Amino acid sequence: MEKVKFGVLGVGRGSSMIKFCETAENAEVVAICDKWEEGLRRKKEELNDERITYYTEADEFLRHPGMDAVVLANYATEHAPFAIRAMKNGLHVFSEVLPCQTLAEAVELVETVESTGKIYAYGENYCFMPAPKEMRKLYREGRLGELEYAEGEYVHNCESIWPQ
């Protein structure tokens, strides 16, 4: 089985995706990028894998030879622009947070997916957290009665992923 060669943008939250790729039999990390040089240096020491190339410049990273896809684990406000750049560079994209800040960004992102034919995946995971799972269980058990309309709201503290 040929492995999908990933690049990861962001060594902070991207660390979990790096670990996943290390254990998946069909994936491998070939490049990691972060403008935070100290974090990048620590990740390089931690992984101690000479097959991985490390970058501080995103444009250079997006041109890494042989890379198939990128995981975006950078600031939330940067996901759509980076996703668009990556797909225009021939790469598939996985965004681990909501990518678009405006409708215009969303339109441009969709148009880029359509024009490049690349896969764009948004990795929303809150639906697998305990609270939504419990609500689904209660509904399926009939403990909420007949549902005619429901609306929910979730507010996540995103201070850590929004630039200061």
Task: For the regions a language model picked out, list residue spans one by one.
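Conserved SAM-binding strand-loop segment of SAM-dependent methyltransferases
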Residues: 51-58
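Predominantly a Rossmann-like dinucleotide-binding segment in NAD(P)-dependent oxidoreductases
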Residues: 126-164
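Nucleotide donor/acceptor-binding cores
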Residues: 2-4, 118, 148
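Structural detector of well-ordered beta-strand residues that form the stable sheet scaffold
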Residues: 55, 94, 121, 150-151
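Glycine-rich, N-terminal phosphate-binding loop of Rossmann-like dinucleotide-binding domains
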Residues: 73-74, 154
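Short, Asp-centered acidic motifs that coordinate Mg2+ and/or phosphate
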Residues: 31, 68-69, 149
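Beta-strand-loop-alpha-helix segment that lines the small-molecule cofactor/substrate pocket
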Residues: 64-65, 69, 75-128, 142
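N-terminal Rossmann-like dinucleotide-binding module
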Residues: 1-49
